[in-house]
Regions:
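Aromatic-anchored, glycine/proline-accented short structural segments
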Residues: 70-112
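Active-site/ligand-binding loops adjacent to catalytic centers
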Residues: 14, 18, 96-153, 174-194
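Small/polar-residue-rich loop-to-helix segments that shape phosphate-bearing ligand pockets
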Residues: 3-73, 115-127, 132-136
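Buried hydrophobic packing segments
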Residues: 64-68, 86-90, 142-152
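Short hydrophobic beta-strand segments
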Residues: 42-49, 73-80, 155-164
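A short secondary-structure junction signal
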Residues: 59-60, 88-92, 171
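Gly/Ser/Thr-rich loops at beta-strand to alpha-helix junctions
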Residues: 4-6, 54, 79-90, 141-144, ...
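Short, acidic/turn-prone active-site loops that include or flank metal/cofactor-
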Residues: 2-5, 26-28, 102-108, 163-164
Length: 194
Protein backbone atom coordinates (compact mmCIF):
# COMPACT_ATOMS: atom_id res chain seq x y z
CA UNK A 1 0.00 0.00 0.00
CA UNK A 2 1.31 3.47 -0.73
CA UNK A 3 2.59 5.00 2.50
CA UNK A 4 1.14 8.32 3.60
CA UNK A 5 0.67 10.36 6.76
CA UNK A 6 -2.85 8.96 7.02
CA UNK A 7 -4.25 5.74 5.57
CA UNK A 8 -6.96 6.37 2.97
CA UNK A 9 -10.53 5.12 3.31
CA UNK A 10 -9.78 2.51 0.63
CA UNK A 11 -6.75 1.26 2.58
CA UNK A 12 -8.73 1.21 5.84
CA UNK A 13 -11.53 -0.75 4.17
CA UNK A 14 -9.04 -3.28 2.78
CA UNK A 15 -7.50 -3.70 6.26
CA UNK A 16 -10.93 -3.94 7.89
CA UNK A 17 -11.84 -6.73 5.45
CA UNK A 18 -8.77 -8.81 6.24
CA UNK A 19 -6.09 -7.22 4.06
CA UNK A 20 -2.58 -7.33 5.50
CA UNK A 21 -1.24 -3.77 5.44
CA UNK A 22 2.24 -3.45 3.96
CA UNK A 23 3.11 0.21 3.54
CA UNK A 24 6.03 1.66 1.61
CA UNK A 25 6.75 4.86 -0.29
CA UNK A 26 6.11 4.23 -4.00
CA UNK A 27 7.70 6.49 -6.63
CA UNK A 28 5.54 5.26 -9.56
CA UNK A 29 3.08 2.50 -10.49
CA UNK A 30 5.60 0.53 -12.63
CA UNK A 31 7.90 0.39 -9.60
CA UNK A 32 5.02 -0.83 -7.42
CA UNK A 33 4.38 -3.64 -9.93
CA UNK A 34 8.06 -4.65 -9.87
CA UNK A 35 8.10 -4.70 -6.07
CA UNK A 36 4.84 -6.67 -5.91
CA UNK A 37 6.21 -9.26 -8.34
CA UNK A 38 9.45 -9.57 -6.34
CA UNK A 39 7.44 -9.93 -3.12
CA UNK A 40 5.34 -12.73 -4.66
CA UNK A 41 8.48 -14.56 -5.82
CA UNK A 42 10.13 -14.27 -2.40
CA UNK A 43 7.06 -15.42 -0.47
CA UNK A 44 5.56 -17.98 -2.86
CA UNK A 45 2.47 -15.82 -3.41
CA UNK A 46 0.61 -15.37 -6.71
CA UNK A 47 1.40 -12.08 -8.45
CA UNK A 48 -1.55 -10.19 -9.92
CA UNK A 49 -0.49 -6.93 -11.56
CA UNK A 50 -2.25 -3.74 -10.55
CA UNK A 51 -5.23 -3.19 -12.82
CA UNK A 52 -5.28 -6.96 -13.42
CA UNK A 53 -3.30 -6.54 -16.64
CA UNK A 54 -3.14 -10.27 -17.41
CA UNK A 55 -4.11 -12.18 -20.54
CA UNK A 56 -6.52 -14.46 -18.63
CA UNK A 57 -8.34 -11.45 -17.16
CA UNK A 58 -8.64 -9.86 -20.61
CA UNK A 59 -9.82 -13.13 -22.20
CA UNK A 60 -12.44 -13.66 -19.49
CA UNK A 61 -13.58 -10.06 -19.72
CA UNK A 62 -13.92 -10.22 -23.50
CA UNK A 63 -16.10 -13.30 -23.20
CA UNK A 64 -18.33 -11.81 -20.51
CA UNK A 65 -18.69 -8.43 -22.26
CA UNK A 66 -19.36 -10.01 -25.66
CA UNK A 67 -21.93 -12.43 -24.25
CA UNK A 68 -23.76 -9.63 -22.43
CA UNK A 69 -23.65 -6.95 -25.16
CA UNK A 70 -23.58 -8.84 -28.49
CA UNK A 71 -27.24 -8.03 -29.19
CA UNK A 72 -26.96 -4.39 -28.06
CA UNK A 73 -26.15 -1.62 -30.52
CA UNK A 74 -23.68 0.58 -28.64
CA UNK A 75 -22.40 3.33 -30.93
CA UNK A 76 -20.12 5.08 -28.40
CA UNK A 77 -18.89 4.17 -24.93
CA UNK A 78 -16.94 6.24 -22.39
CA UNK A 79 -14.87 5.02 -19.47
CA UNK A 80 -12.13 6.28 -17.21
CA UNK A 81 -8.67 5.02 -18.01
CA UNK A 82 -5.97 4.01 -15.58
CA UNK A 83 -4.19 0.79 -16.55
CA UNK A 84 -6.40 0.55 -19.64
CA UNK A 85 -7.36 -3.08 -19.12
CA UNK A 86 -11.10 -2.36 -18.98
CA UNK A 87 -11.08 -0.11 -22.05
CA UNK A 88 -8.99 -2.45 -24.21
CA UNK A 89 -11.05 -5.47 -23.12
CA UNK A 90 -14.30 -3.71 -24.05
CA UNK A 91 -12.76 -2.67 -27.39
CA UNK A 92 -11.99 -6.29 -28.26
CA UNK A 93 -15.45 -7.47 -27.19
CA UNK A 94 -17.29 -4.66 -29.02
CA UNK A 95 -15.43 -4.11 -32.31
CA UNK A 96 -18.13 -1.86 -33.83
CA UNK A 97 -18.29 0.51 -30.85
CA UNK A 98 -16.37 3.81 -30.70
CA UNK A 99 -14.55 4.36 -27.40
CA UNK A 100 -13.53 7.41 -25.40
CA UNK A 101 -10.97 7.02 -22.61
CA UNK A 102 -10.60 9.60 -19.85
CA UNK A 103 -7.27 9.49 -18.01
CA UNK A 104 -7.67 10.45 -14.37
CA UNK A 105 -4.50 9.23 -12.72
CA UNK A 106 -1.47 8.98 -14.98
CA UNK A 107 0.25 9.66 -18.27
CA UNK A 108 -0.73 7.24 -21.02
CA UNK A 109 1.98 5.39 -22.92
CA UNK A 110 2.12 4.54 -26.62
CA UNK A 111 -0.10 1.56 -27.45
CA UNK A 112 -2.18 1.60 -24.25
CA UNK A 113 -5.26 3.30 -25.71
CA UNK A 114 -6.14 0.75 -28.34
CA UNK A 115 -8.57 2.56 -30.65
CA UNK A 116 -10.07 4.84 -28.00
CA UNK A 117 -10.13 8.60 -28.40
CA UNK A 118 -8.11 10.08 -25.56
CA UNK A 119 -9.16 12.72 -23.03
CA UNK A 120 -7.25 13.77 -19.92
CA UNK A 121 -9.00 15.22 -16.88
CA UNK A 122 -7.24 18.35 -15.65
CA UNK A 123 -7.67 17.79 -11.91
CA UNK A 124 -5.20 15.96 -9.69
CA UNK A 125 -6.15 12.36 -8.92
CA UNK A 126 -7.35 13.01 -5.37
CA UNK A 127 -9.35 16.13 -6.30
CA UNK A 128 -13.02 15.35 -7.00
CA UNK A 129 -14.92 15.99 -10.19
CA UNK A 130 -16.59 19.37 -10.60
CA UNK A 131 -19.99 17.72 -11.07
CA UNK A 132 -22.07 15.12 -9.26
CA UNK A 133 -23.15 12.06 -11.21
CA UNK A 134 -26.82 11.05 -11.23
CA UNK A 135 -25.68 7.58 -10.05
CA UNK A 136 -23.42 6.25 -7.29
CA UNK A 137 -19.89 6.94 -8.46
CA UNK A 138 -16.48 7.70 -6.99
CA UNK A 139 -16.00 11.46 -7.32
CA UNK A 140 -12.22 11.24 -7.75
CA UNK A 141 -12.43 8.54 -10.44
CA UNK A 142 -15.48 7.67 -12.56
CA UNK A 143 -17.20 11.02 -12.01
CA UNK A 144 -14.34 12.71 -13.87
CA UNK A 145 -15.11 10.57 -16.91
CA UNK A 146 -18.79 11.48 -16.60
CA UNK A 147 -17.82 15.15 -16.45
CA UNK A 148 -15.98 14.91 -19.79
CA UNK A 149 -18.80 12.87 -21.35
CA UNK A 150 -21.17 15.70 -20.42
CA UNK A 151 -18.78 18.20 -22.07
CA UNK A 152 -17.91 16.23 -25.22
CA UNK A 153 -20.37 13.35 -25.53
CA UNK A 154 -23.58 12.90 -27.46
CA UNK A 155 -27.10 11.86 -26.48
CA UNK A 156 -27.17 8.05 -26.42
CA UNK A 157 -23.50 7.56 -25.50
CA UNK A 158 -22.90 4.81 -22.96
CA UNK A 159 -20.79 5.29 -19.81
CA UNK A 160 -19.03 2.49 -17.92
CA UNK A 161 -19.08 3.25 -14.18
CA UNK A 162 -16.32 1.15 -12.62
CA UNK A 163 -17.41 1.47 -9.00
CA UNK A 164 -19.72 3.16 -6.60
CA UNK A 165 -18.83 4.39 -3.16
CA UNK A 166 -18.06 1.85 -0.49
CA UNK A 167 -19.31 1.92 3.08
CA UNK A 168 -17.17 4.04 5.39
CA UNK A 169 -14.68 1.94 7.35
CA UNK A 170 -15.14 1.75 11.10
CA UNK A 171 -11.40 1.90 11.82
CA UNK A 172 -9.86 5.36 11.85
CA UNK A 173 -6.66 6.61 10.18
CA UNK A 174 -5.22 7.17 13.67
CA UNK A 175 -5.57 3.40 14.31
CA UNK A 176 -3.07 2.57 11.54
CA UNK A 177 0.59 3.56 11.22
CA UNK A 178 0.80 4.18 7.47
CA UNK A 179 3.74 6.60 7.40
CA UNK A 180 7.09 5.31 6.09
CA UNK A 181 10.40 6.82 5.05
CA UNK A 182 11.84 6.19 1.58
CA UNK A 183 13.43 2.73 1.43
CA UNK A 184 11.53 1.36 4.46
CA UNK A 185 10.39 -2.16 3.51
CA UNK A 186 9.91 -3.54 7.04
CA UNK A 187 6.30 -4.56 6.37
CA UNK A 188 7.44 -6.68 3.41
CA UNK A 189 10.57 -8.13 4.99
CA UNK A 190 8.72 -9.75 7.89
CA UNK A 191 6.92 -11.97 5.32
CA UNK A 192 10.05 -13.11 3.45
CA UNK A 193 11.07 -16.74 3.73
CA UNK A 194 14.68 -17.23 4.83
Amino acid sequence: MPASKEASEHQLTAIENGGIPMFTRIPAMPTANIWAKQFAQKTGAKYLPFGLKHEMVVAGGVRIFYDNFKDTDIETMWSVFSTGVLSRTLQIALPKTKFNAVAVARNIQEGELGRAKFYSHDRAFLKPSRIQTPFDSIQTYDAKGWELLKQHGQQGDWFWNVAGNMPKPTIKPSDIDSSREWGDFKDFEKHYKD
